[in-house]
Amino acid sequence: MLINKLWLLLVTLCLTEELAAAGEKSYGKPCGGQDCSGSCQCFPEKGARGRPGPIGIQGPTGPQGFTGSTGLSGLKGERGFPGLLGPYGPKGDKGPMGVPGFLGINGIPGHPGQPGPRGPPGLDGCNGTQGAVGFPGPDGYPGLLGPPGLPGQKGSKGDPVLAPGSFKGMKGDPGLPGLDGITGPQGAPGFPGAVGPAGPPGLQGPPGPPGPLGPDGNMGLGFQGEKGVKGDVGLPGPAGPPPSTGELEFMGFPKGKKGSKGEPGPKGFPGISGPPGFPGLGTTGEKGEKGEKGIPGLPGPRGPMGSEGVQGPPGQQGKKGTLGFPGLNGFQGIEGQKGDIGLPGPDVFIDIDGAVISGNPGDPGVPGLPGLKGDEGIQGLRGPSGVPGLPALSGVPGALGPQGFPGLKGDQGNPGRTTIGAAGLPGRDGLPGPPGPPGPPSPEFETETLHNKESGFPGLRGEQGPKGNLGLKGIKGDSGFCACDGGVPNTGPPGEPGPPGPWGLIGLPGLKGARGDRGSGGAQGPAGAPGLVGPLGPSGPKGKKGEPILSTIQGMPGDRGDSGSQGFRGVIGEPGKDGVPGLPGLPGLPGDGGQGFPGEKGLPGLPGEKGHPGPPGLPGNGLPGLPGPRGLPGDKGKDGLPGQQGLPGSKGITLPCIIPGSYGPSGFPGTPGFPGPKGSRGLPGTPGQPGSSGSKGEPGSPGLVHLPELPGFPGPRGEKGLPGFPGLPGKDGLPGMIGSPGLPGSKGATGDIFGAENGAPGEQGLQGLTGHKGFLGDSGLPGLKGVHGKPGLLGPKGERGSPGTPGQVGQPGTPGSSGPYGIKGKSGLPGAPGFPGISGHPGKKGTRGKKGPPGSIVKKGLPGLKGLPGNPGLVGLKGSPGSPGVAGLPALSGPKGEKGSVGFVGFPGIPGLPGIPGTRGLKGIPGSTGKMGPSGRAGTPGEKGDRGNPGPVGIPSPRRPMSNLWLKGDKGSQGSAGSNGFPGPRGDKGEAGRPGPPGLPGAPGLPGIIKGVSGKPGPPGFMGIRGLPGLKGSSGITGFPGMPGESGSQGIRGSPGLPGASGLPGLKGDNGQTVEISGSPGPKGQPGESGFKGTKGRDGLIGNIGFPGNKGEDGKVGVSGDVGLPGAPGFPGVAGMRGEPGLPGSSGHQGAIGPLGSPGLIGPKGFPGFPGLHGLNGLPGTKGTHGTPGPSITGVPGPAGLPGPKGEKGYPGIGIGAPGKPGLRGQKGDRGFPGLQGPAGLPGAPGISLPSLIAGQPGDPGRPGLDGERGRPGPAGPPGPPGPSSNQGDTGDPGFPGIPGPKGPKGDQGIPGFSGLPGELGLKGMRGEPGFMGTPGKVGPPGDPGFPGMKGKAGPRGSSGLQGDPGQTPTAEAVQVPPGPLGLPGIDGIPGLTGDPGAQGPVGLQGSKGLPGIPGKDGPSGLPGPPGALGDPGLPGLQGPPGFEGAPGQQGPFGMPGMPGQSMRVGYTLVKHSQSEQVPPCPIGMSQLWVGYSLLFVEGQEKAHNQDLGFAGSCLPRFSTMPFIYCNINEVCHYARRNDKSYWLSTTAPIPMMPVSQTQIPQYISRCSVCEAPSQAIAVHSQDITIPQCPLGWRSLWIGYSFLMHTAAGAEGGGQSLVSPGSCLEDFRATPFIECSGARGTCHYFANKYSFWLTTVEERQQFGELPVSETLKAGQLHTRVSRCQVCMKSL
């Protein structure tokens, strides 16, 4: 039973493990010697047969069986009952045709049909006769200059020239550097140099004195002021409208009491202009500066035709061309032979001061005496194999040993230096790997292969072997430190124990311990089995040359000799190097305070720390003064008195005074240093190993809808280009940094089989099926370095990069080889004081220093007695205006204002002042004050940088004397006006002008008559000039991660990497598991606290240049440091070696003008000048005959025009437009995030193996070549250094189209491109005969807008405008706004060059304000300038984000109800009918479109047509009793021929007895106005006698009565929509309209007119009662008519 349970348990465990492993990754690497990849395999014994089980339950019913066979026939049945009546039969046949009927009556003729569609076009006409062949056209203009061709082949060597002695030969090659010359005498002082570039802005000067009182400014924009004092009574208003004549006559109210004084009346009209003022008392202005050069005048009239010139003589032969490009680098030379042994070095020199200059080490000495007793002998021969041991039993693990005592705390180690140490001791043997394949045959030894049939048990552990052989002799060490003078002898008391230090780093393995005592001899053990082959030990370093050996037989080691006697004291050596600075001593005891002499009064010290608050002072007299200007920086204070004697420091360590010391052992690694400053960008290192794949990225956010008229998506990736021309060989790069140690290599490749060749490659297999995506494999080994491919084609020129940040100072170069020691020179004379140095870069802000010692205490003087108040002074003269006062106390928070209107867009703000310092950080470890480091050597020349930003305006260089050029003279006096010349010939078309301002919209053109034939597609144009690079694009939205790529094939095994530098010891890991299965790595520990700063170590070797780091974020602009004081002039140094050529010097003083030189070479073609004005139109020529069609040559594309001004931002379009053309390539963006891992490429073709196996040594660097001309874009460079190792994600899914970005700002102007290729020359035609004078042409289309005209004179002052409609003033609280803060000071501009003084012109008129210029690039942030004058009002600013809600203000007084303001009209119309003779005014705030007469409806052919009184069609501008005409089918129209009628809204005039006509009609016809309303108007009806309210947010226009319907012509009439304003008439009348007869021209009220009105309905009558009939007489009519109100939405 127990066995069964165990069996079940094992099976369960196996199943569980299989299930658990089902979803996991199978990992084939060995794990602790076990095979963990498969499931458990268990083979227990088979169990005995079990007991029989109980009887099972009854099974379910089986399925239905198959159908049986057919049975026998039954007996015949009985007769059935009769059936029901059957259905109807089918329809019968068609009967015979009937008799024809009678003819019908003719129908009424139908209406004429619609005109038919346009017929198809007619047939083409006959071709015209072919015209006569025209004369050939004139010669075309010469083509533009083509781009420079490819450099030609190097020409053959020229013929020798016999040069007479007067000619100067060609310049020879540069000679070898000459020896240093003798120091020349001191030269005379040089001329002062040219004015240098503008220095950095100086410190802000003190505020200047207040200026004189300025002229009155423009009238400001006032805010609503506080409520004023009540005004006087206004003028009487105009007479009101006549009263409504209703049925009830209103007698008026009794007179009330006298009211209180009224509100102020409306603002009066502006007064008339006052008399002109007296002339001002200003003095005559100073002479103005010379005016700018005028714009080119208008072209003169056309001149007479010139005669044809004579052909010029042929030109002279050109001069010899410039030097060609430098040739390619030659091949590497063969390694030279080994040189001879050099001359012996110099002996010891002793200079004048007695200093010994030691020479090089001497030759090896003679062999020494026989040595002392040697160590243990070499290992003996190998003994015979022992007997195989017994199989070991697995022992029981021992008990845990007792816990050891805690060790003493170790001293703090010095900081180690990162060096590449020698190879370490061999590590412990690893576990046995799987057996490898047979290796290649060993070339050195021949061994018999031992065939082990079965592996034996492991043998017992052998004894420790004897001591190994002596190692090779080590390298001689450097001299050690020496402190001959000893340390400070005073020993301080022991300090208090410090706090426990942070966890130290894991130390390196300790040194090998001393050998222990020899154990007693063990019994002879049996011979062990052959052990595993140990790993190959590392090669030792190369030893120095050994001593000569005299004896051929190695002697036995002698006994150890006695200790030698004390040697004599050696000669005092040279002073050793400075020792390591000791630790800071403890504070000394207070010294004796001797009475010092009183020093001079010191300058004020630095402010001390904030003291305790003092007691409150007595109240002072007087008002607070204005703050004084900031003082200049004070003088430098004198040095303080020497401090008191400190306590004696601890005794220093005296090193033994041995000058030629040997290297000590390597120190323990120090604590990690603080992070250094960001290094400069390193050179590319060797390619690192491929990083592991990153995890899949998060899905990107979906893009927004693409809008039309914007650049489209990038096109598909083009096909691979053709291979490019071979590029020039690049310079050898610096050696890369040593890579990190490579991973252990995989199984070695099979050894070479000499004599056999590689077989031919097999045929390519078929495409396999796509496998499932594999899991992430182990990192592949680095592949072999591929053979360099052919250089690619010339790539396109890269875009202009963004200006790089200035690189940091380069690292110090490697020290040069030391030259021969020079003899120490005498002290030179003190040099002349140097020029002030250039201001250095602002230093980085240092860490906060230690708290200084307390300053010396000077006795504080007693406070003086309080002075008596002085007598009042005399009244002074009126002072000049004071400087601006201090900002007042902040006002109490005013009441909350209404939301202001959207402001204008402001100019870009000035860069802000430095922000408030952040909160104080944690206290840093005190840094030691560094000494000023030596200037670094010049770095290696960097690669060519990106094109920089345009520099500032340079200093004008002195003009080179050129032939036939004179300096520009002063501007001459103005000549008298010349007479008008003849019209000149029409000039050539000028260059494309700058885009003018947007012209006014042109008049619409007439539609074309003939549709043009669609032309053939023209040939592709030549490549246009490259556009300007766009500004840097904003970072795009991260796309979705792509699908995982397929696993790449394993690369070819790479060459072994160079040994990497030893890394710093890692942090201590967690305790590993005891089982031999690798545990998962633990989480990263918390960073330890910073250790104490170690003492300064010796200077380490210069490390290799590191990999380039990622591009850092742009740092914040540091605070400008104070300008340092110029240092005292230093003593002259020893003459140095000859330096490298210096940087170009600054421009010297401008020399005098030299004599005219010989004519210079023809310069390159200049940039096109600014376009001239268009010439006058030429005289009309005579019409020529038709020429033959010339060959169609596509013209050269013109140069790209200058970019136009930035357009206003358009409204977003609707819908998804078609993808636009690909946009111009933007400027180089910031460095993007590391890209996702692309799919694995196909395996490359095997590289070509070059025949040479020996790599040559790099050649010496060549001399610098001449500056070449601007080359073409070079070939694509080699692949850059590997990016930082990051997890490469799978390729993302394509994102949705992004939103189009806003239109970018204007880019910088690009460099003009090369001129296009010249077109093919056409055939020269015959000269045509002059044609006849043509007829004047039609008026052409409107021309392009002209240049802006000259500014006109100031016009007379316009008359005062009419008072505008008052705006809608919301009920606002009176807000008292405090004056805003002063604006930031503007940046001072670069001072311009001084122009020539012009003649004094008359004082010009005040110019108009210019348009805002194109915003320039942001200049560098200057120091704060002086406060600028008040600027012009800025453009409206963008609406800022909504501010936080302010505290609720105090309740202000209620303002007067404002007049309704004008809002933006959007085209709604509103019709107002007055029902009187007067034209009704439009409601306030609406504009009147037209006025007219109120037409209600018309009747024609006994049919009525109604007009809605709320629509503009009911207000006809002109009145007629017959406002329409009728027409019939015969295309005949009649007017006033029938009894047709028109019906008009009527007035309140009494009903006449007879029809009225002509001049009596107007008093009965209602007038109307059509108004433009800001929103829709509606009518609301109460169905009650009360006036309904407008909906919330709507305002009332008028109230009235609900007019529903009307009839007049029998049953004909019309009605009003109850939502229309026409259904609400202001006056109620039983007969609100009058009938006019068209034919008779009369109007009258007839008895068949009825008006229908909405009636009142009580709430209870809705469904409960029947309507009761009633008749209302005059006087009661209003009681049953519904009231209404017309409302409009308030905006």
Swiss-Prot record:
Residues 588-599, 1210-1220 have a biased composition (Gly residues). Its main location: secreted. Residues 108-338, 404-473, 486-881, 915-1099, 1185-1459 are annotated as: Disordered. Residues 185-197, 311-320, 421-431, 503-512, 526-541, 641-652, 660-703, 722-735, 802-820, 853-878, 1055-1068, 1234-1253, 1384-1397, 1429-1459 have a biased composition (Low complexity). SMART domains: C4. Residues 1360-1371 have a biased composition (Polar residues). Residues 842-851 have a biased composition (Basic residues). PROSITE patterns: NC1_IV. A motif (Cell attachment site) lies at residues 515-517, 560-562, 986-988. It is found in: Secreted, Extracellular space, Extracellular matrix, Basement membrane. Prolines at the third position of the tripeptide repeating unit (G-X-Y) are hydroxylated in some or all of the chains. Type IV collagens contain numerous cysteine residues which are involved in inter- and intramolecular disulfide bonding. 12 of these, located in the NC1 domain, are conserved in all known type IV collagens. Belongs to the type IV collagen family. This is Collagen alpha-6(IV) chain. It comes from Homo sapiens. The gene is COL4A6.
